[in-house]
Amino acid sequence: MAGRGTGPDFVEALARGLDVLRCFEAERPTMTMTEIAAAADLARPTARRLLLTLEELGYVRVAKNSFSLTPRVLQLGMAYVSSLGLWQIARPHLETLVRQTGESSSMAQLDGSDIVYVARVAVPKIIALRVEIGTRFPALLTSQGKVLLAALSPGDLAVTLAEPSRAGLPPFLPRDPQAIHDELRTVRARGWALANEELAPGIRSIAVPVRDGEGTVRAAMNVTVHAAETDVETLTTQYLPHLLRTASDVSAEWALWQSRPHAEVTLSHPVAI
């Protein structure tokens, strides 16, 4: 991961420190210094200095020669979410949508060839996937990802699809490029996307775009269901109208928030803290 910078202002030490933080995943929440050095492609002395610096700053902790992240790293991700205003705006709308459908609902944005969850309201159901704010999945395997990819220009789409996933999942079988473009063209035309057990067996979802004040697609909102409980027809005939209405409300409120960047915006719903 290290050594990718070429510009005169690129700070390699900062990039390496971020590489160290990105090494920690759900599958490996605790790692030794040797494991971190290998995962981040760093010399062990370099990894040691970075880890000790991060420990002093409060971003990692060490116990029995193993390192793990601390809750302080949440400040980095939540600063981004808060700066968008998306979570504060979307949460009450997602809660209403969940009450209407009885199913979990989330919002995600594109980061490379992955989606990253930026808002979520879940119902207490056992599902095969653990999803929370910050979770990454390959965009092509998700309804939200398809919506976001469909909104890209041909050039941006080609660059995005060429990027490797950083979701930490096993490689998925490659698809025919023409089939991908055909599906995304359909998504773009009809305004919604479906993922039918592509990410995981038994998981089905439908997603629609969330737009900013200029009409640009900036996020995608979905409803996720158990495939054994809810068929595609129910998703498209019963849940999709609620989803489209909710996304429209969030888009309108987000556009208002963006138009008044230095003002206090009165939301249409109280925001729970």
Feature-to-residue mapping (PLM):
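N-terminal helix-turn-helix
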Residues: M1-Q88, S248-L256, V271-I273
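Amphipathic alpha-helical effector-binding/dimerization core
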Residues: S66-P164
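Juxtadomain coupling helices with adjacent low-complexity linkers
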Residues: R190, R218-I273
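Short hydrophobic beta-strand micro-motif common in sensory/regulatory domains
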Residues: R204-V208
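Sensor-regulatory modules in signal-transduction proteins
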Residues: V210-G213
